[in-house]
Amino acid sequence: MEKEVTAIKAQKRNPNRVNIYLDGEFAFGLSRITAAWLQPGRKLTQVEIDKLVNADDHEVAFQQALHFLSYRARSEREIRKNLAAKGFSEAIIDETIEKCKAGNYVNDLEFAGQWIDNRNTFRPRSPKLLKMELRQKGLPDATIDQALEKVTVPEEELAYKAAQSKAERYQLLDWQSFRTKLGNFLLRRGFSYQVAMQAVKQVWQELADHPTSPKTHLNGEIND
């Protein structure tokens, strides 16, 4: 049994979607892309109606994925979780992911590289901690290891950079307190004790050698 398209009206809250009326009654909403070929007077079979609704579900899922990606890069698993939370079926999610991959909107290796570069630039941490973070994002070890292989900055340099970002806050402390606080900070960033202590000593000495260093900062010697 066929139904006739009697009206196509733009939605007030979303100009990119339209409401479809069949036989004079509201039937369902569609994206403008999905409804582009429809016009009043067109008659639809139930099979065609089902295809339209299914196609719209796929389009809505894809647009949701793009919206989710608009804030920052995402891993494949992050997108899957977001779409599942929005109520999309596993089949639609799978197809949406493939569509995103085809458009290079989703690439876990590129995501890992961007994540690592961002961390190393603004909040340095050890490769060990980076790997843990990327695992939490759902990336496989092979992809993470491939991304980490491209990192050319030595771990000691990353620890030193991280130490520098906090050193000024502790510059009035004596050596023991300085070492404890800054050392613990670096350990939380995933650096080994040896690497952390090397960075702490280097930063302490630089602060002590600075001509404007507070005299209170120089009280105390470096004793392991």
Language-model segments: residues:
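An alpha-helical, amphipathic repeat domain used for nucleic-acid recognition
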Residues: 1-224
